[in-house]
UniProtKB/Swiss-Prot annotation:
GO cellular component, one term: endoplasmic reticulum
Localization in the cell: Endoplasmic reticulum-Golgi intermediate compartment membrane; Golgi apparatus membrane; Endoplasmic reticulum membrane
Domain L-type lectin-like: residue ranges: 52-275
Transmembrane segments: 485-505
Main location class: endoplasmic reticulum
Disulphide bond pairs: C198-C238
Basic and acidic residues bias: start-end ranges: 278-297
Name of the protein in question: Protein ERGIC-53
GO-annotated molecular function: calcium ion binding; D-mannose binding; identical protein binding; metal ion binding
Amino acids binding Ca(2+) 1: D160, F162, N164, D189
Modified residues (Phosphoserine): S433
Gene3D superfamilies registered for this protein in UniProt: 2.60.120.200
Length: 517
């Protein structure tokens, strides 16, 4: 089970301003606004990332997913699950179906991360019932909770597609913990037992939906890729549970179920990583395999090598005209290389803005929790609950609530400005049909929106320092000496001039070429 930590309203407001200022300094102080936000050491304020080790015994992905006997290596499937060469259909689109797959051995990881790629497809606008990702002490091969057993000891992340309580809050992603003694509340979609949740539509997407679930330092974080783009790293924040206590050893699993309505629940991959905190020694690799297994693997390798050689000979005999011919267009031209470099620079700016937007989402979610806790406290005081010595007065609570609401409004305005900037950057990345003037106008709009974001953050900082409490934030880290503001502005101007000159040169060449036709 998990217990969420509640901090005081004053500490919450102070931590919000500190985190907001530090995130903006990281955004401005990165290498040309294009540093990889996920790379260790990309900014001075960013913590060192943990060491990741891939665990193949707790993972699967296609192709060649199943063996000749229809089983998945290191995994056990039950119910109506159907393994195939490139995916596992956990539950087919038939009524009242259940299926699940579980690891055969228990994992003993202190910190871990799983990346799951799946599809949920159906004919109707409403689907049922949903899919669940598990980490439990024992396998739940069959049961009423999305195809798995009830009263589990561990945590389940539910992708619930059917609205049982009629509140029109589905599809939703719900994190539910259990200590092995609680029955799941089906009628209310687990709302009374949810530790965290978010509303995301994961049905009938053009690309597979991806979920990244991280358990690190007793904090469970769920990130979602909605499947609108082919970008595998386009994750957004969904839910976070702090002080999450789970079994030290457990099985990973996936289950799904259908009811009166039915969807196809397909899992394309399940990748597990063991995380090691910085400074600790990474886990030692397993011992060498036995001689018998080595001989077996060597025989399989030789067999596959012979088949590959035969396929090569057959292809060469069937396509003799392709032998010895050099491939065309191997090397890119100078113009293509320059255009590619411009697009890569714009893409880095786009990714940096998305990273800042993701951080603002997490801060906004935390502030909503603070406002909710303060509202409950005010309601209890209004009902006549006697106060305790040392607690703040009603007027102070009202002031803090008003401040929090104003902060939420400011953050929403900043998010809207960031979305507009991302839209303009996306327009710049496809300038094939636009002229020089339109391209220049896009650059000016992007610059204007970035100034708006900076001004909003400065106003929030000044407002916080003008209050009576005057919260003290940590000193901002020094900007890197490798690149100053003047150099950065000169670089942007030179890049813009070169890009406009290239577009004008290309337009003149095309106009000159048209004279011959």
């Amino acid at each position: 089970m998990a217990v969420s930590r509640r901090r005081g309203p004053q500490a919450g407001a102070q931590s919000f301003f500190c985190a907001l200022l530090l995130s903006f300094s990281q955004f401005v102080g990165s290498d040309g606004m294009g540093g990889d936000a996920a790379a260790p050491g990309a900014a001075g304020t960013q913590a060192e990332l943990p060491h990741r080790r891939f665990e193949y015994k707790y993972s699967f992905k296609g192709p060649h997913l199943v063996q000749s006997d229809g089983t998945v290596p290191f995994w056990a499937h039950a119910g109506n699950a159907i393994p195939s060469a490139d995916q596992i259909r956990i539950a087919p689109s038939l009524k009242s179906q259940r299926g699940s797959v579980w690891t055969k051995t228990k994992a003993a990881f202190e910190n871990w991360e799983v990346e799951v790629t799946f599809r949920v497809t159906g004919r109707g606008r409403i689907g049922a019932d949903g899919l669940a990702i598990w980490y439990t002490e024992n396998q739940g091969l069959d049961g009423p909770v999305f195809g798995s057993a009830d009263m589990w000891n561990g945590v389940g992340i539910f992708f619930d597609s059917f609205d049982n309580d009629g509140k029109k809050n589905n599809p939703a992603i719900v994190v539910v913990g259990n200590n092995g003694q609680i029955n799941y509340d089906h009628q209310n979609d687990g709302a009374t037992q949810a530790l965290a949740s978010c509303q995301r539509d994961f049905r009938n997407k053009p690309y597979p939906v991806r979920a990244k679930i991280t358990y690190y330092q007793k904090t469970l974080t769920v990130m979602i890729n909605n499947g609108f783009t082919p970008d595998k790293n386009d994750y957004e924040f969904c839910a976070k549970v702090e002080n999450m206590v789970i079994p030290t050893q457990g099985h990973f699993g996936i289950s799904a179920a259908t009811g009166g309505l039915a969807d196809d629940h397909d899992v394309l991959s399940f990748l597990t990583f063991q995380l090691t905190e910085p400074g600790k020694e990474p886990p030692t690799p397993e011992k060498d395999i036995s001689e018998k297994e080595k001989e077996k693997y060597q025989e399989e390798f030789e067999h596959f090598q012979q088949e590959l050689d035969k396929k090569k000979e057959e292809f060469q005999k069937g396509h003799p005209d392709l032998q010895g011919q050099p491939a065309d267009d191997i090397f890119e031209s100078i113009g293509d290389r320059e255009l590619r470099q411009v697009f890569e620079g714009q893409n880095r700016i786009h990714l940096e803005i998305k990273q800042l937007n993701r951080q603002l989402d997490m801060i906004l979610d935390e502030q909503r929790r603070y406002v909710s806790s303060l509202t409950e406290e005010i309601s209890r005081r209004g009902a006549g609950t006697p106060g305790q010595p040392g607690q703040v007065s009603q007027q102070e609570l009202d002031t803090v609530v008003r401040t929090q609401l104003e902060i939420l409004r400011q953050v929403n305005e900043m998010k809207n400005s960031m979305r507009e900037t991302m839209r303009l950057v996306s327009g710049v990345q496809h300038p094939g049909s636009a002229g020089v003037y339109e391209t220049t106008q896009h650059f000016m709009d992007i610059k204007e929106h970035l100034h708006i974001v900076k001004r909003d953050i400065d106003s929030l900082a000044q407002r916080s320092m003008s209050s009576n409490e005057k919260p003290k934030c940590p000193d901002l880290p020094a900007f890197p000496s490798c690149l100053s503001t003047v150099h950065f502005v000169i670089f942007i101007v030179v890049q813009t001039v070169l890009f406009i000159g290239y577009i004008m040169y290309r337009t003149q060449q095309e106009a000159a070429a048209k004279k011959f036709f």
